[in-house]
Design a protein with these regions (language model features):
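Positively charged n-region of N-terminal signal peptides that target proteins for export
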Residues: 1-4, 42
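Sec-dependent N-terminal signal peptides
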Residues: 3-12
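Sequence/structural signature of beta-propeller domains
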Residues: 17-301
């Protein structure tokens, strides 16, 4: 049996270290598939319990991988006619008919040179039974949205979908910690050759607090984000921390995100790259680009 490594994290507000609340984190498994070299996004399956989807970073194959809680690959799906220019995040959600789908964000732009970025959507694929080889399959033609920012090129590593409204969001990444949340427009019909223009919702600043006694990691750059399935929380990852906001009913996203978030610090995790919620809207799952790639579960009292 694979050992479960217990580590601990601290939960603090963004303004104080007092009232520290310990929480438990488990390194559930390491991914065994050597083809997953830089896990850059993670999404909870909406069809299969205990299954997550991930993908490689820029320049990798345009493929998504289904992984289970033993670290085994249960599917490898190549997105038809897709290109991995800089895939940075993925999420799960429903299409207009209520069918479970995977959304992949080719949204990275370190050099700020892309006129538009892409978001792909496919129906969530089948997976192989446990213990059977996961042969590569090719998806049907994906839905592809080409999107641009209203204020010029931006770099981003966070793709998230609000579970109640179905609206797709992108949270940008900044070396200075000055991120911004954008949403897709209400009308998703595109004219040929013209990208959709994203709508800016609010700015979010990550201050980059240092972790005492730890190797310095820049904590200002946002590397992943997700909405909770119940729509009541939003979590954003930096290289070494997680920040979680409560989203009260009756408040806009901009109003809720203007408040100080709770800060979670997963110990022994290097280069935190992706985060998603479990089905209970409280458990958090994270991966890292560090090899071997860990799958870590964070639970709170």
């Amino acid at each position: 049996m694979r050992p479960v490594f217990l580590i601990f994290l601290l939960l603090t507000t963004a303004s104080a270290q007092e009232g520290v609340t310990p929480s438990k984190s488990e390194r559930v498994t390491d991914l065994t598939d050597t083809r997953i070299k830089e896990s850059s996004g993670i999404a909870r399956s909406l069809r299969h319990d205990g299954i997550f989807w991930t993908h490689n970073d820029s320049g990798g194959e345009p493929c998504v991988f289904a992984i289970d809680l033993q670290g085994r690959t249960r599917a490898k799906v190549r997105l038809r006619e897709a290109v991995n220019f800089d895939w940075e995040d993925m999420t799960s959600g429903l299409d207009e008919q209520g069918a479970p789908c995977l959304f992949v964000g080719d949204i990275g732009d370190n050099l700020f040179i892309r006129r538009s970025v892409q978001v792909y959507r496919i129906l969530e694929p089948n997976i192989a039974p446990a213990g059977q080889p996961a042969a590569e399959t090719i998806s049907p033609q994906p839905q592809v949205w080409h999107v641009s920012y209203p204020n010029g090129s931006q770099n981003a590593e966070s793709l998230l979908i609000h579970p109640k409204t179905g609206r797709i969001h992108i949270l940008t990444k900044s070396n200075e910690g000055k991120s911004a949340l954008y949403g897709f427009p209400a009308a998703l019909t595109q004219k040929k050759g013209e990208p959709l223009i994203l709508e800016k919702i609010t700015d979010i600043t990550f201050t980059g607090e240092e972790r005492t006694g730890k190797r310095h990691v820049d904590d200002r750059m946002c590397t992943g984000a997700a909405f909770a399935p119940d729509g009541r929380h939003l979590v954003a990852a930096t290289y070494s921390s997680l920040y979680e906001w409560t989203l009260p009913e009756g408040q806009t996203l901009a109003e809720a995100l203007a408040k100080k978030p709770a800060r979670l610090i997963p110990e022994l995790v290097r280069q935190l790259e992706a985060v998603c919620y479990g089905a209970d809207s409280r458990t958090l799952w994270i991966t890292s680009e560090h090899l071997p790639t860990p799958l870590i579960r964070i639970t709170r009292d």
